[in-house]
């Protein structure tokens, strides 16, 4: 198959050194550059116990060795397509998902146009008997308003571009399907249930997939797929982006929406990265930063000004799309819009470096029930009392209408009450009753906010120092609700962000341009076989980049390079949990944690032998309320390190024991166990018998 036939993503394998050098020179994305950071990790079935654990039986997919393929000149794009294919669950699922998305958007616009232009509502709502036929109420010869015509033209251009992308993706996905089937030996049925770890384990065994590194590893693949996203995670973590609304009384509101995300990434990625997804060399030149900063500011303002012209149409489209998407759900489940979900800002706060989207989504999914239980631990008795009263009044009337409707169909369809039939009142009353009942406090609910927060932290890996020991307070709850908000609030913000985003781009983000350029320049390193990446994703320079309050060994004074809330440490541990085969022999952080864990275990054993004030492995809590003891009793689901972190008892237990180890590790044990708890719901659950500190000893 020729280069043209393969869609331009493949190059024939070249054994000649001159040809190899040609590819390296022309496509740095596939070659990378040599540096001291990173290193190859040779993987085989014989010396890698992580892969052995993946084998459920002797017929595991891993028994079939991948075959060689032609060298690929844009390995980032190829691996991203491979991952998206895995996430989309195969060719047919991706095909129909994209097709239905196209058809749905077209249907929304055409149906709305039909309702606005061609329906004669004067005849439709007339009271003449018999009612007019449908053809009398529809007039396809009616003129289309100018504003709607402009909207339809803009939408048509957008829809045609999506259609072109759809046909282009068919060819790409077909090639990726062949790669899965012929090279990785994974068929369409297995792609529905296979773990990404197993896909990675097969990818790294494909001969000569990367022409400048003999063996890729899981970290190389993650860094290629998330080459750009790691920079965004770092920018959010270090609070570099100015996302405030530049209006009086709104300047303290900082939020991220889908519209703002798209605008920000479009502004940055097309400016900073080349066509192969590699950061341009000029951004690593300190003498060019002033010029690049001015250019980025102009780019923000230009995109913001263009956004002002498209704002009415995007706002209009989102509004009608919301109506068609949620009307049926609002009718059948009125309370669903008042369910809660993590805000986009919270998602970026929780997202860890080199954490692929499906892993991250799994963490969020596991956290929802516990987060809701935490919020419900702060009931408003007054609101509940009012809601119960309203529900009783309207529910009584609703019950009468339903009973009368069962007795007589004529009553429910024709009887007039203030010019409305009972069926209309049933719909309104049913909605009110559903909403008010969702606000009534469960009488059997037990107040245990600390326990629910601990379980939430297990999955979000997010616990600010200001929350420790205060999770029962309304102050912490209010801060938590900023991150965990109503769905309807999220949608309303998305709608109005279309109005605010252009002004944020024009007035707020340009103030961050210099800091953004400095961040990209200061935080770009070259990883062997991968090329220029965000140094936070390298997972090697812990002393310079880590958070010393979380045991990172950090002694650097360069504030722009530091991470907050142990982002780097948590990311390393989480990545190790998700990829046990990743070689970490030279990782300072994991070596330090291993030593800390051993000493901590020895210290705990000594404490247990010499003290009677322990329940299991837990030090006596500073308080002795019934809730605390119940929390201890239930803590076999939650590692005691997380309990200590949430209740703020870690330092108390250290003060009670003068022989406790005095590492510069702060609450590092909480971070270890946060990540280890991911294993509880993972593929490896059955493989690990010791899910807590024993896991760290085995790293």
From Swiss-Prot:
Residues 300-320, 488-508 dip into the membrane without crossing it. It is a multi-pass membrane protein. The chain crosses the membrane at residues 99-119, 140-160, 386-406, 421-441. It comes from the Eukaryota. Induction: Expression is up-regulated during development and Legionella infection. GO terms for cellular component: cytoplasmic vesicle membrane; Golgi apparatus; microtubule; microtubule organizing center; phagophore assembly site; phagophore assembly site membrane. Forms a homotrimer with a solvated central pore, which is connected laterally to the cytosol through the cavity within each protomer. Acts as a lipid scramblase that uses its central pore to function: the central pore opens laterally to accommodate lipid headgroups, thereby enabling lipid flipping and redistribution of lipids added to the outer leaflet of ATG9-containing vesicles, thereby enabling growth into autophagosomes. It is found in: Preautophagosomal structure membrane; Cytoplasmic vesicle membrane. InterPro entries: Autophagy-rel_prot_9 (IPR007241). Keywords: Autophagy, Cytoplasmic vesicle, Glycoprotein, Lipid transport, Membrane, Transmembrane, Transmembrane helix, Transport. It comes from Dictyostelium discoideum. One of its GO terms (biological process) is sorocarp morphogenesis. Disruption phenotype: Displays severe developmental defects as well as a strong phagocytosis defect. Residues 1-98, 161-299, 321-385, 442-487, 509-699 are cytoplasmic. Residues 599-620 are annotated as: Disordered. Residues 120-139, 407-420 are lumenal. Residues 599-618 have a biased composition (Low complexity). PANTHER family: APG9 AUTOPHAGY 9, AUTOPHAGY-RELATED PROTEIN 9. Glycans are attached at residue 139. This is Autophagy-related protein 9. The keyword Translocase does not apply. Its main location: membrane. It catalyses: a 1,2-diacyl-sn-glycero-3-phosphocholine(in) = a 1,2-diacyl-sn-glycero-3-phosphocholine(out); a 1,2-diacyl-sn-glycero-3-phospho-L-serine(in) = a 1,2-diacyl-sn-glycero-3-phospho-L-serine(out); a 1,2-diacyl-sn-glycero-3-phosphoethanolamine(in) = a 1,2-diacyl-sn-glycero-3-phosphoethanolamine(out). Pfam families: ATG9. Homotrimer; forms a homotrimer with a central pore that forms a path between the two membrane leaflets. Phospholipid scramblase involved in autophagy by mediating autophagosomal membrane expansion. Cycles between the preautophagosomal structure/phagophore assembly site (PAS) and the cytoplasmic vesicle pool and supplies membrane for the growing autophagosome. Lipid scramblase activity plays a key role in preautophagosomal structure/phagophore assembly by distributing the phospholipids that arrive through ATG2 from the cytoplasmic to the luminal leaflet of the bilayer, thereby driving autophagosomal membrane expansion. Belongs to the ATG9 family.
